[in-house]
């Protein structure tokens, strides 16, 4: 038994490093003098980088399996998800250093960031209803605090309260749904759940629907999406970058694992998810058309991107491209989203469309990064969003949802208009005369540019990445 426990612990060393790193940062923040508080960022970044190195090794040398009595999946899907979340975490730490420099006691912020990342990772690997709830709550509770972290900012506090209040009902409903399913199956692990769930019943339908709503909230999908634009606009900009990216990674993979164990003939989950995808991408794109604030536009863009990601879930078990398209979409989205919010962070205080007039002349590198992020969201080659969109459309068509792929193409065309409303003034309008906009810090600019380069690199390296993503299993299915 001791050897078995040792082996199981060894399987999750990257997650343990993140947990220990969060505790160390918290202790440092409690006892270190105020002038040393920024050192918490270095500790947090070191923990995230070490965890990323370890998970890369796990991706190469460890077989895909379930561990901890089938409650946690160590497959390539989890490993890639961990890498995506950690890339976002390291980038957001770099964005946060100067943003919170004036806060005399901000070391615990990095603890919350690491714990929130851990929550998203647990969500991605959860193969048990209890693990699913644990990941959801850890990611959500830390997200509420991070969103409202600027205590003296009315917009930050308001966004945090809205995030909490709008999440209370879906999260509570998910707990009830988990209780329903546990009562029906007499087990909480997904392998046992799949074996025990029989013919459809009202309780099974209600339980599955409540869990679906809880995960939809985490993703920012219709009809529980209203928090996303408010958080994107009101939270500290580095937090907005993180909250609109990392939980989406964990939430989409958690949803994929959950629906894969539901009885395929007893529960009509596929058309429900397809309708959610259609409604989410359409509402997100239409709402973004009228936005003049860049942060709010990115919030609605995040909603629409969730709709595209749900297409991969719809295609599960019907298309060989489903898992590959899901991973490629997440890679493209995380890099593009953090890059776009990185520009907002580097140009602190400039969020109105008029503020970006002539940015291509005054800050050409940052303007290029924002353009790369937007063009990737649209799906312009050779950026990462192009192969991601192709894979998603192909998966939906193979799964028999051609209408959803056509609607996604229409929505992609719609998105061109609101992205162009920001891109055109950056390059075809003279600066507003206020001079060159000041940068928050070199760290923020460097992280932003690195993410922009990542968007290009992933698009260029699409073929080898697709081969690697194709080896990922969706355990326990």
Q: Can you describe what each PLM-predicted range is?
A:
Residues 1-477:
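Alpha-helical transmembrane segments of multi-pass membrane proteins predominantly involved
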């Amino acid at each position: 038994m001791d050897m078995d426990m040792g082996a199981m612990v060894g399987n999750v060393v990257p997650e343990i490093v993140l947990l220990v790193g969060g505790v160390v940062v918290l202790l440092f923040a409690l006892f270190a003098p105020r002038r040393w508080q920024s050192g918490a960022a270095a500790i947090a970044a070191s923990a995230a980088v070490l965890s990323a190195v370890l998970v890369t090794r796990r991706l190469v040398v460890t077989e895909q399996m379930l561990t901890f009595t089938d409650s946690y999946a160590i497959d390539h899907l989890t490993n890639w998800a961990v890498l995506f979340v950690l890339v976002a975490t390291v980038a957001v730490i770099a964005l946060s250093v100067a943003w919170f420099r004036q806060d005399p006691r901000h070391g615990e912020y990095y603890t919350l960031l690491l714990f929130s990342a851990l929550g998203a990772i647990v969500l991605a690997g959860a193969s048990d209803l209890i693990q699913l709830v644990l990941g959801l709550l850890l990611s959500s509770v830390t997200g509420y605090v991070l969103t409202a972290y600027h205590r003296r900012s009315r917009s930050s506090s308001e966004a945090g309260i809205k995030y909490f209040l709008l999440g209370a009902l879906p999260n509570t409903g998910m707990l009830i749904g988990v209780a329903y399913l546990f009562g029906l199956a007499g087990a909480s692990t997904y392998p046992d759940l799949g074996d025990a769930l029989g013919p459809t019943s009202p309780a099974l339908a209600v339980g599955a629907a409540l869990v679906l709503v809880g995960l939809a909230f985490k993703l920012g999908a219709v009809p529980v999406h209203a928090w996303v634009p408010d958080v994107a606009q009101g939270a500290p900009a580095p937090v907005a970058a993180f909250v609109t990216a990392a939980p989406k990674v964990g939430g989409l993979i958690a949803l994929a694992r959950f629906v894969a164990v539901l009885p395929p003939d007893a529960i009509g989950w596929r058309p429900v998810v397809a309708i959610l995808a259609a409604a989410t991408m359409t509402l997100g794109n239409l709402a973004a058309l009228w936005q003049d604030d860049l942060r709010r536009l990115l919030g609605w863009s995040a909603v629409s991107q969730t709709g595209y990601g749900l297409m991969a879930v719809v295609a599960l078990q019907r298309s060989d491209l489903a898992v590959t398209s899901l991973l490629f979409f997440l890679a493209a989205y995380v890099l593009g989203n953090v890059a776009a919010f990185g520009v907002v962070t580097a140009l602190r205080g400039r969020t109105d469309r008029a503020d970006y007039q002539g940015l291509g002349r005054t800050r050409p590198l940052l303007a290029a990064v924002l353009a790369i992020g937007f063009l990737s969201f649209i799906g312009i080659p050779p950026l990462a969003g192009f192969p991601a969109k192709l894979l998603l459309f192909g998966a939906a068509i193979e799964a028999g949802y051609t209408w959803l792929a056509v609607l996604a193409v229409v929505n992609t065309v719609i998105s061109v208009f609101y992205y162009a409303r920001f891109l055109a003034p950056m390059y075809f309008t003279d600066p507003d005369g206020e001079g060159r906009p000041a940068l928050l810090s070199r760290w923020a600019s460097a992280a932003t540019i690195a993410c922009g380069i990542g968007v290009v690199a992933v698009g260029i390296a699409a073929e080898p990445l697709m081969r690697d993503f194709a080896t990922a299993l969706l355990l326990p299915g």
